Each structure stands twice: as C-alpha cells, then as structure tokens.
C-alpha cells in the first residue's frame, strides 16, 4: 500500500518524518499482510514539483508508476481538523477521482475515518482555511425569497 501523507506545512522536517513513521506503523498494524510505504507531501513536492502548483497538485493524484502503470499512491491520509490550500486541492481532487482519503488521529495504532469533503472556511488563510469533514457534508439552508 502506497500512502500520500498530507501533513501540515508548519510541521518541521523532524516532526513530519516521525509522524510518517507512526502512520506507517499504524497502517501496518491494521494491514499486516501488506507492505506499507508512506511518503510525506513535503518529500513528494521536493522530488516532483516542476514550478506549477496546480499541475503538481493534480499530478500527486494522477501520477502513475512508469513500469507498472498503477497509481503512485493507493490512499491519501490527512491529519488535523483543517488544512491549507494545496492539501485541500489534492484531497478534493482525490475524492473527485474516487480515490480513498482518510483522516488519521496521529497516534499508533490510532483511528482512521473516511473523509467525505473538504470545504473552504477562510479563503484568505492559505495554511488552515479549509475544514476536513468526516461525515456527510453539512446541510446548508437555502436563502428564502421573502
């Protein structure tokens, strides 16, 4: 299982690597017959970013292995209650493509929950302006004409 770990940009390199190892251990405990590989978003960005943010975000979801043709990532995992613009775009695109996206509580063995939507809550906050929803999207009251 190949996992894209969507961590906060504010995490230090050390913290990101530690959490990626914890995520790998948590997923391996839940899937003992599978080899688990976790790649933090920062590592993917450093290795694959070619100067265009929108293209890189789509590429994370659509990129395939040159040899096998299979998607580079089988699953996408996010941590926290909110995320930034790039993470929101990646995860929303993954959801649109029917790819599995899960929220993780950051612990081992930890809890995993399916992400249903990611909605903009503050468009001016590019680091935390999107809210991760684990249940069906919240209902919105339509404006009445009177």
Enumerate the language-model features and the residues they cover.
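Conserved catalytic or regulatory cores that recognize and/or transform ribose-phosphate-containing ligands
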Residues: 1-146
């Amino acid at each position: 299982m190949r996992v894209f770990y969507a961590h906060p940009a504010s995490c230090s390199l050390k913290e990101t690597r530690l959490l990626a190892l914890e995520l790998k251990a948590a997923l391996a405990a839940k899937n003992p017959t599978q080899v688990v590989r976790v790649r933090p978003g920062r590592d993917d960005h450093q290795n694959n970013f070619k100067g265009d943010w929108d293209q890189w975000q789509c590429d994370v979801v659509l990129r395939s292995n040159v040899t096998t043709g299979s998607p580079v990532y089988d699953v996408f995992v996010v941590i926290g209650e909110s995320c930034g613009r790039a993470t929101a775009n990646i995860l929303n695109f993954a959801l649109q493509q029917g790819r599995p996206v899960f929220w993780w509580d950051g612990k081992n063995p930890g809890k995993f929950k399916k992400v249903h939507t990611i909605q903009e809550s503050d468009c001016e906050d590019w680091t935390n302006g999107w809210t991760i929803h684990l249940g069906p999207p919240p209902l919105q009251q339509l404006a009445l004409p009177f």
